[in-house]
């Protein structure tokens, strides 16, 4: 199965343009499926993939309390894999063609209030003033994620040449290998300048290549490290929800809309293929308006 998964991974990367994060999730789902298959029908290989077996696998995860959004992704992983396997001649019929994708409940994302975002960014800036290159980098991670609303995988994938410092623009490669240009403001520019002039030169090695953000050993920063940076920074803010990079992305989108930004402009900045995805943030702002109204209006 390992050889098959390696081929499928190459297909996801080269033909579908899937990110490393997505590919890792898909392969993890398939390894879970194959382990389930080996337990139920040892030695059957891909031929053991049937619609009832796939439904049993999903049902086992559902019974274990797996979130509906995760079940939806696992279903998508399997459907993508089996369709590919049919085209490759690895299996005859597609057992997942009639497998229903569970609809994920669309919940309002946790976001920072604007004052909480300011406190988190000020804490990161204060920590960087000592000149430690990792602290300088961490300030840039938090500042740039909030300033631009880009995904953490997009941030960590940036090269130095993807930054136009004169016009304060990022050239971002998003999902499906779609490229977009995203502006950033003066605070992010200050954090970037400090990193390029002080932090990055202190960490760079022969292995750094063109990567903009580096880890402690000089290699390209891993998104998991960036997530840790965000969690640690935000956790120091009193009363703030426990959020990671995606929470900063949610916060940036929400605060843009609260400031009067056009929905389609926010869609372009975030790299959403569907306006419906961006519209989720309008519900956050409406929910906040309702909460303020209920608290402040004498006849609420």
From Swiss-Prot:
Q: Which residues form the active site?
A: 151, 175, 246, 249, 272, 281 (o-(3'-phospho-dna)-tyrosine intermediate)
Task: List localization entries.
Answer: Cytoplasm
Q: Which residues form the Tyr recombinase domain?
A: 107-294
Q: Which UniProt keywords are present, listed alphabetically? A: Cell cycle, Cell division, Chromosome partition, Cytoplasm, DNA integration, DNA recombination, DNA-binding
| CDD domains attached to this UniProt entry | INT_XerDC_C
Q: Name one GO cellular component term.
A: cytoplasm
GO terms (BP aspect): cell division; chromosome segregation; DNA transposition
Q: Where is the Core-binding (CB) domain?
A: 1-86
Q: Name one GO molecular function term.
A: DNA binding
Family named by the database record: Belongs to the 'phage' integrase family. XerC subfamily.
Q: Which NCBIfam families match?
A: PRK00283.1 (NF001399)
Described purpose of this protein according to its UniProt entry: Site-specific tyrosine recombinase, which acts by catalyzing the cutting and rejoining of the recombining DNA molecules. The XerC-XerD complex is essential to convert dimers of the bacterial chromosome into monomers to permit their segregation at cell division. It also contributes to the segregational stability of plasmids.
Subunit structure comment from the entry:
Forms a cyclic heterotetrameric complex composed of two molecules of XerC and two molecules of XerD.
- Official protein name in the record: Tyrosine recombinase XerC
Annotated organism of origin: Mycolicibacterium gilvum (strain PYR-GCK) (Mycobacterium gilvum (strain PYR-GCK))
């Amino acid at each position: 199965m390992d050889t098959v998964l390696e081929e499928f991974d190459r297909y996801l990367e080269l033909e579908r343009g899937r990110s490393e994060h997505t590919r890792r999730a898909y392969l993890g789902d398939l390894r879970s499926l194959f382990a389930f298959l080996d337990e139920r029908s040892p030695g059957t290989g891909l031929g053991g993939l049937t619609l009832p077996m796939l439904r049993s696998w999903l049902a086992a995860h559902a019974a274990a309390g797996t979130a509906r959004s995760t079940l939806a992704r696992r279903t998508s992983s399997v459907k993508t894999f089996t369709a590919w396997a049919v085209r490759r001649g690895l299996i005859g019929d597609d057992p997942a063609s009639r497998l229903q994708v569970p609809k994920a409940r669309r919940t309002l994302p946790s976001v920072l209030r604007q004052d909480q975002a300011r406190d988190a960014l000020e804490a990161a800036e204060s920590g960087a003033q000592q000149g430690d290159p990792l602290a300088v980098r961490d300030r840039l991670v938090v500042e740039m994620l909030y300033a631009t609303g880009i995904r953490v995988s997009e941030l960590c994938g940036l090269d130095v040449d993807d930054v136009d410092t004169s016009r304060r623009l990022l050239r971002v490669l998003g999902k499906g290998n779609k490229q977009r240009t995203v502006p950033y403001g003066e605070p992010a520019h200050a954090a970037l300048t400090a990193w390029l002039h002080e932090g990055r030169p202190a960490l760079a090695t022969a292995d750094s290549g063109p990567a903009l953000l580096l880890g402690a050993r000089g290699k390209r920063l891993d998104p998991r490290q960036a997530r840790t940076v965000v969690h640690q920074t935000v956790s120091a803010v009193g009363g703030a929800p426990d959020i990671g990079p995606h929470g900063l992305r949610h916060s940036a989108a929400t605060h843009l809309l609260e400031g009067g930004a056009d929905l389609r402009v926010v869609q372009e900045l975030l790299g959403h293929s569907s306006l419906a995805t961006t519209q989720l943030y309008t519900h956050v702002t409406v929910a906040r308006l309702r909460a303020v109204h209920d608290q402040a209006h004498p006849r609420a």
